[in-house]
Amino acid sequence: MEKSLLFHFRRIGVEFIIFSVYAVFSISWAATGSLMPLISNDLALNTQQATLITSMIVVAKIFGASFTAFLVYKFGLKKGYFLGCILMSSGIFLSFVDSYSGILIIRFLTGLGSACALVCLVPIAQQWFEKKALHFVISFNITSNLVGITLGLVLAESISNYFGNWRDSLSFYAWINLILLILWLFVGKDENKKEEKKNNAKDLIYALKSRVTWGMIIFYIGPILFLNSLFTFLPTFYAQYAGFSKELADFAKKEIPALANFAIIFGPYLGLFFKRKNISFKIMLLSGGACIFICGFCMLFLQNLVLIQIFAVLSGIFYSM
């Protein structure tokens, strides 16, 4: 791997872009949940319709891995990443779309793009970094989701107030991603190995036929829906249905999702500990899913804020275990 000064500047630029793209998406995703009362009032939506706006991203993520594999195989990593992630910038049209169905389509496209951004974090890092640096960069990139969601929960209302409406504030994040992806065209690179495409085709077909692939996809639908509910349904639940005072509800709807997402950092360490104790991955998946269900139940029906905070932290740990 070349070590010129230009190379180092270029890979710093690449790292900044791929981290920021997914972080900005995560800000937008979390902000949508925080702004859902405004969106619901503006569009006259019921609870089910409002939930579907954010759930469309989850639905798209289910198909996103296969979609990304096809793009990378067909166009290479540089163009595939660009074409996939550019779908996230479809949010720039939120300012002009008035129909509920149009918004759902934009959210679905955004979800497909976000899946591409997430899946490509590792292969892009492998292009530019080696050994210890690579492990650090991959771990660092994973936190982009946490950073984005936390910023979204904290800043969503302030940014919306600055723009004066929820449409322009959500479009703002899409414009940022569009600028980042244009920069990507100048710093990204493709592999020049002719045999790689053949190998990728075999790997893609094998992965699509694998029972493990589809089993993992089906299993993670539940945890992803839970993660989605943390910053979509829960803030609305605490504000309107939990019976909390206004001050307590305003505190809970921001802190509880933030705590759960912060705790996600520590889940892999618990998983590694159990793995060293020779506990199988299958058992960890099943027990982790059951614990997430218990934590979610307690977060909904407990009235003690301290206990809700504890179960929020535990839910984040079990989610990423």
Swiss-Prot record:
Assigned keywords, A-Z: Cell membrane, Membrane, Transmembrane, Transmembrane helix
Transmembrane parts of this sequence: 12-32, 52-72, 86-106, 109-129, 136-156, 168-188, 214-234, 254-274, 292-312
SUPFAM superfamilies in UniProt: MFS general substrate transporter
One Gene Ontology cellular component annotation held by this UniProt entry: plasma membrane
InterPro entries from the UniProt entry: MFS, MFS_dom, MFS_Efflux_Transporters, MFS_trans_sf
Keyword Membrane attached: yes
Pfam families: MFS_1
GO molecular function: transmembrane transporter activity
Membrane-related topology note: Multi-pass membrane protein
UniProt subcellular location: Cell membrane
Protein name as catalogued: Uncharacterized protein Cj0987c
Origin species: Campylobacter jejuni subsp. jejuni serotype O:2 (strain ATCC 700819 / NCTC 11168)
Lineage: Bacteria, Pseudomonadati, Campylobacterota, Epsilonproteobacteria, Campylobacterales
